[in-house]
Amino acid sequence: IIGTPTYAVPTWMVEAYPDVLAETVRGRGIYGTRQNMDITHPVYRYHAEKVIRKLMEVSAHRKCVIGFQLDNETKYYGTAGRNVQLGFVKYLREKFHNDLDTMNHEFGLDYWSNRINAWEDFPDVRGTINGSLGAEFEKYQRSLVEEFLGWQAAIVSEYKREDQFITHNLDFEWRGYSYGVQPDVNHFKCAKHLTMAGTDIYHPTQDHLTGAEIAFGGDLIRCLKNDNYLVLETEA
């Protein structure tokens, strides 16, 4: 199984384009960790597409390659910079058919002078005290993951054979091991872009092993396609 190597950005990219790092509620990220980039950034997307296409050109025809894994445990990594804010406003305009009154009513924005009277005046949602608007923004952020995986799946599909699958290692909330539903990803929507569901399940070991995490993770991932699935990473 060949994985697309897009879950960590190289040093030269950050040096040349520092804004490829995600801007979150804590500000701009600092290079060092993996999975700290803005998955919507056009420069990141440009170079990611180049490396995906090159990888597919040299690997898709090989008989030993049975399938492809898109990225790695993809999430939105808290990205909430200017481009994401503008995308959210566009999303709301489409959702509410450009009707500000309906949107203000839906989210209760007349409270504490939160009312928005012009789309051009839409504030940075990172500072909102409105739980409904904040939840809608997180929903939008989760949709970025779905769009990102769909974008990669479309590229891979241009090269893969009919007998090769497309999967992704969907993960879970983390509390020292896999724990409950992943809050940053809608697994069911992302699975639409996969031909075979996949997951990472990390569990407690030895005296702490109960099987609960394994059973929960397996049940959830099986439901995505109502079929067998791949465990792409697990506790060693």
What name fits each language-model region?
Residues 16-207, 211-214:
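Polysaccharide-binding and catalytic clefts of secreted carbohydrate-active enzymes
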Residues 1-3, 166-167, 198, 231:
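Structural detector of well-ordered beta-strand residues that form the stable sheet scaffold
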Residues 9-16:
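Glycine-rich, charge-decorated loop segments at or immediately adjacent to ligand/cofactor-binding or catalytic sites
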